[in-house]
């Protein structure tokens, strides 16, 4: 990658990261970079969004998602 293309890629990632923060997505630069690369390879962005949501749902501890039982 030449210097200009590298600079443009960094600026684009920074812009996407700022937008991500405004939207409070919780995604870091590395994750956003991977998602962008997958989109560039032709992966459906809506499918990626679904996967990210599902992975987040699975990563929430059970104690947070369930109500405590009253004995």
UniProtKB/Swiss-Prot annotation:
The gene is GIP1. It is found in: Cytoplasm, Cytoskeleton, Microtubule organizing center; Cytoplasm, Cytoskeleton, Spindle; Nucleus; Cytoplasm, Cytoskeleton, Phragmoplast. The keyword Nucleus applies. Disruption phenotype: In the gip1 gip2 double mutants, embryonic lethality and impaired development of male gametophytes, severe growth defects and sterility, characterized by microtubule (MT) misorganization and abnormal spindle polarity, resulting in ploidy defects. Required for gamma-tubulin complex recruitment to the microtubule organizing centers (MTOCs). During mitosis, modulates gamma-tubulin complex localization, spindle stability and chromosomal segregation. Necessary for gametophyte development and embryogenesis. It comes from the Eukaryota. Belongs to the MOZART1 family. Keywords: Cytoplasm, Cytoskeleton, Microtubule, Nucleus. It comes from Arabidopsis thaliana (Mouse-ear cress). Mostly expressed in siliques and flowers, and, to a lower extent, in leaves, roots and seedlings, with highest levels in young tissues and meristematic cells, and the vasculature. This is Mitotic-spindle organizing protein 1B. One of its GO terms (cellular component) is kinetochore. One of its GO terms (biological process) is CENP-A containing chromatin assembly.
């Amino acid at each position: 990658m030449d210097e200009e293309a590298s600079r443009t890629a960094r600026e684009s990632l920074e812009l996407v990261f700022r937008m991500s923060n405004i939207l409070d997505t919780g995604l870091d630069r590395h994750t956003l970079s991977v998602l962008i690369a997958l989109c560039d390879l032709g992966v459906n962005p809506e499918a990626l969004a679904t996967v990210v949501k599902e992975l987040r749902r699975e990563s929430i501890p059970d104690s947070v998602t369930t109500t405590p039982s009253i004995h």
